[in-house]
Amino acid sequence: IRLFDDDVFLQHNAFRAPGAPSIEELRDAPKKIDYLKGIYSKMHKGITTHPAIDANNVGLLDGITFAFLCIDAGEGKRAVIEKVDALGVSIIDVGMGLELVDGSLGGILRVTMSTPSNRAQARERISYIGGGEKDVYSSSIQVADLNALNAVLAVIKWKKLIGFYRDLEGEQHSTYTTDGNMLLNGDGE
């Protein structure tokens, strides 16, 4: 398991991270990947951490067999996706767009699977452009429930991919909209 992230683990991260960090852990302000490695290494062996992934070090992905991606939009994300495409590796990319209107949040969660057989469709769905100045998510707003739901939807999609869950639809792209509680699937087989 390879973890990539250059963020520092601060109080706003604690609300959406597994477990409950101590005040001492928060004061130490470790890298987020080091905090998560400490938790997950109690259950898994072979976890390695890297502070960042971008066009300069995508070779760190050599040898992977699958990837979950939750990367800020930009050229670094494009380089990672091009690398996993070249490796022939399936990925699941998640994203979230939020807006604040009249003091109330609304938004859409996205889960997109890219396999060697659907690269073109997936590339149309994966965003490389950030939310700009209206991007509420970048303000560290606390939406742990939406982060968790997006992660769970990604894991369910992966379990369908490996045959654990039945997948009659074969959807490769799903969105969840908070207003109306709508879960929509697209790009099926």
PLM ranges: what are they?
Residues 2-44:
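Glycine-rich phosphate-binding loop and adjoining beta1-alpha1-beta2 segment
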Residues 44-51, 58-150, 160, 177-189:
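E1/E1-like adenylate-forming module used to activate ubiquitin-like modifiers
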Residues 2, 13-23, 53-69:
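Long, low-complexity, intrinsically disordered polar/charged segments
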Residues 152-166:
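Oxidoreductase and adenylate-handling cofactor-binding alpha/beta cores
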Residues 30, 34, 145-153:
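Electropositive phosphate-/nucleotide-binding environments in soluble metabolic enzymes
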Residues 165-177:
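Core catalytic loop region at the nicotinamide-binding pocket of NAD(P)H-dependent oxidoreductases
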